[in-house]
Amino acid sequence: MEHVHSIMIIKKENKYLNYYDDRWKMYLFPNMKGNNIEEIKAKYKTDNVKFLFEKVHEKFSVSNNKMKLYHHYFYEVEDSDIEGKYFTLEELLKDPKVKENNEDIISFIKEYYEKK
């Protein structure tokens, strides 16, 4: 069974918005279950949302202690007024917990922007 999630990429220059997740005890990219661009537009109160790419990959689920198949959709939200904590990808990867649990997502994003 695929686990579908949308990842929102909100940039200021070379930094990306992340939020601290109390459950995971680490910073994460804004995300939501499912793949509905209209929900993303409503959440951020903007029509400036664009689909970038998608990735299907297997990943170990720490919370369920087993391998799962994930289908991630990546969207860019263009709105410089969104407040929060912004990091470079390198800054995020300096955190061992982020590196262990989210390096795949960060590498997908890095790969996308390096090809642009």
PLM segments and residue spans:
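Conserved Nudix-box catalytic region and its N-terminal flanking loop in Nudix hydrolases
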Residues: 6, 12-47
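Nudix hydrolase/Nudix homology domain
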Residues: 24-25, 81-116
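Functional cleft and adjacent loop/helix regions within the main domain
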Residues: 25-30, 59-63, 76, 115-116
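Acidic, metal-coordinating catalytic segment for phosphate/diphosphate chemistry
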Residues: 1-7
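Short connector loops at helix/strand junctions that flank enzyme active sites
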Residues: 3, 29, 68-72
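Hydrophobic residues at beta-strand termini and immediately following loops
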Residues: 19, 52, 87
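Short, well-ordered beta-strand micro-motif
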Residues: 9-10, 74-78, 88
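Active-site segment of metal-dependent pyrophosphate-handling enzymes
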Residues: 41, 45-81
